[in-house]
Amino acid sequence: MKTMDAQEILRCYAQGQRDFSHINLVRVCLSNASLIGAQLIFVDLGGANLTRAQLDSATLKNANLALANMTEVCLIYADLSNADLSGANLVGADLTNADLSGAKLGGADLRKANLSEASLRGADLRGVNLIEANLTNTDFSEADLTGAYISDGAVINVVNLS
């Protein structure tokens, strides 16, 4: 797996490259970075800082984002299917229409996150914090919500829990 640093990935993105699959970006700082539409399949972003990064329509299938700081990250229409977000900080993240099917989110902090229209079908949400999250039309079918915190101001409208 090739390793890149933040400057290198941002330079390549600015030059038009969008496919960064199978790259090692462990603990990289990409806060406030704009990587809209980037292909980050099987990327290792464990412990990375993605605070306020713009990752709309990005593909992060099977990515490792465990323990990543993703506070206020923008992941509208992003594909995070089968990604590992265990213990990630997603406070205030915008995951509107995101695909998180089969994702591992155990212990993740999603307080005040926007998950409207998102798919969490078959996701592992054990112990996840969803306090004050927007869960309008969110698909939780076949998801494991054991020990999840969902009260205290969560917006729940037409949620699929089948």
Curated annotation (Swiss-Prot):
Q: Does the keyword Repeat apply?
A: yes
Domain of life here?
Answer: Bacteria
Q: Report the residue ranges that make up the Pentapeptide repeat domain in this protein.
A: 33-72, 73-112, 113-152
Heme found in the keyword field: no
PANTHER family, sorted: THYLAKOID LUMENAL 17.4 KDA PROTEIN, CHLOROPLASTIC
Name the residues that span the membrane: none
Q: Which UniProt keywords apply?
A: Repeat
Q: Gene3D superfamilies, from UniProt?
A: E3 ubiquitin-protein ligase SopA
Name the InterPro entries on file.
5peptide_repeat
- Tell me which SUPFAM superfamilies the record gives: Pentapeptide repeat-like (SSF141571)
The record ties this protein, via Pfam families, to: Pentapeptide (PF00805)
Q: What is the lineage of its organism?
A: Bacteria, Bacillati, Cyanobacteriota, Cyanophyceae, Synechococcales
Annotated protein name in UniProt: Uncharacterized protein slr1851
